[in-house]
Curated annotation (Swiss-Prot):
Enzyme class, broadest EC rank: oxidoreductase
Family matches, as InterPro entries: SOD-like_Cu/Zn_dom_sf, SOD_Cu/Zn_/chaperone, SOD_Cu/Zn_BS, SOD_Cu_Zn_dom
Gene3D superfamilies reported in the protein's UniProt record: Superoxide dismutase, copper/zinc binding domain (2.60.40.200)
Binding site for Zn(2+): 62, 70, 79, 82
Main function: Destroys radicals which are normally produced within the cells and which are toxic to biological systems.
Enzyme Commission identifier(s): 1.15.1.1
Cysteine-cysteine disulfides: 56-145
Protein name as catalogued: Superoxide dismutase [Cu-Zn] 4A
Length: 152
């Protein structure tokens, strides 16, 4: 089993820890929690770069090794990093439990060293008709991010 972790932080008080596990060539399970969010839906994505020199802005676009359009996690046409939305309750906490086959921890398309980002607004899953729907899901600003690193 391969394990990874991302510790999320931001200047806006949003923070959390996200864990990734993968058995063999199976899907990757993503668990954890993020606090300090406004209640409601927030876009949740793996971004291409593990660079936080300019905060979450320098993490680049959604991780997209197959050059597809933005979509929902269940869509065939989606970025590998499109993990949909997480839901923050009235307490501002989002508990995450996602399983996805397009974010491996090993091999040529591994997400190790890339970043996970939580956005300010809901991801419209590419179906919102906004000019940004097919690239970002119109999910708004980046409120927290962390670099995905191997865990022992």
């Amino acid at each position: 089993m391969v394990k990874a972790v991302a510790v999320l932080g931001s200047s806006e008080g949003v923070k959390g820890t996200i864990f990734f596990t993968q058995e063999g060539d199976g899907p990757t399970t993503v668990t954890g929690s993020v606090s300090g969010l406004k209640p409601g839906l927030h876009g949740f994505h793996v971004h291409a770069l593990g660079d936080t020199t300019n905060g979450c802005m320098s993490t680049g676009p959604h991780y997209n090794p197959a050059s597809k359009e933005h979509g929902a996690p269940e869509d065939e046409n989606r970025h590998a990093g499109d993990l949909g939305n997480v839901t923050a309750g009235a307490d501002g906490v989002a508990n995450i439990n996602v399983t996805d086959s397009q974010i491996p921890l090993t091999g040529p398309n591994s997400i190790i060293g890339r970043a996970v980002v939580v956005h300010a607004d809901p991801d419209d899953l590419g179906k919102g008709g906004h000019e940004l729907s097919k690239s970002t899901g119109n999910a708004g600003g980046r409120v927290a991010c962390g670099i995905i690193g191997l865990q022992g």
